[in-house]
Amino acid sequence: MKTNFHTHNYRCGHAVGNVEDYVKVAINEGYSELGISDHSPVPDYYQDRMKIEELGDYLLEIEEAQKKYGDKIKIYKSLEIEYFPEWQEYYDELKKKLDYIILGLHAFRIEGENKIYSAWNINAEEHVLA
């Protein structure tokens, strides 16, 4: 059984294609299950992820693919999140709309700082040693 539970689409800014594109490829490659799991939007942080305004269309696009291709492949609704305690209530609400959540570790804070750093943009020795 071939499965993939970690996929992204154009909304994150570092992948291409829409949900249906990924579903078609998965079917052609013989996958039985596919999780659509783009980077979750979060309040006040927009780097490498969809915008909050895109979330509704993202979920709708997955639901449409589930209806259209459900007889060929099992499609799951998911998001990849960065965890920060102050976003817990937001994530609790998101979980109600999803089949699962992936924890990604692409963003972090340095103790004593309020700023969120992206792991993709680490360029100072003190960040690496933190």
Predicted regions and their residues:
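Conserved, mostly hydrophobic/aromatic
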Residues: H6, A26, I101
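Extended recognition/assembly regions associated with phosphoester-bond processing machinery
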Residues: C12, V19, Y45, E61-I62
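Acidic-and-aromatic substrate-binding clefts and catalytic sites of carbohydrate-active enzymes
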Residues: R11-G17, E82-W87
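Histidine-centered catalytic micro-motifs
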Residues: K2-G13, I36-P41
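Glycine-rich, proline-tolerant flexible connector loops at the mouths of alpha/beta enzymes
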Residues: D38-M50
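Hydrophobic residues within beta-strands of alpha/beta enzymes
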Residues: L34-I36, I101
